[in-house]
Amino acid sequence: MTVVTCVFLDHVHHDPAQGDSLIADVTSFLFGQVAGVVQSCVSDQLTAAGDLGLPRGHRLVEPSSRLQGKAIMVALPEDRWHVLTCEHTLEPVAFHLSHVLHESQQRHRRGRRRSKP
């Protein structure tokens, strides 16, 4: 199960099919190094209710609970065999009636040019 800090879930958008590119970007940003080696960062300040979260908005800890002790963040390369691919939804665009009319005119022209069997 993947656990990611909620800060990254809110601000990082990537395609899971890209594999290690996100891991390389995140580790180079956080640690100034290249991915491929396990990197860790220890923090004493990870005590807020929403600091750790699961993908798709689920929370690892309850909002009323507080974490005790130190939290360790580890960046590991993903196993490409267990990555589910998904496509991002497209941005909505304005509907132009002229596009539909143009497409129907092209379809009508193609129909005339075809030879009948």
Swiss-Prot record:
The UniProt keywords, alphabetically, are: Transposable element
Name recorded for this polypeptide: Mini-circle uncharacterized 12.9 kDa protein
Q: What is the protein's species of origin?
A: Streptomyces coelicolor (strain ATCC BAA-471 / A3(2) / M145)
Q: What is the lineage of its organism?
A: Bacteria, Bacillati, Actinomycetota, Actinomycetes, Kitasatosporales
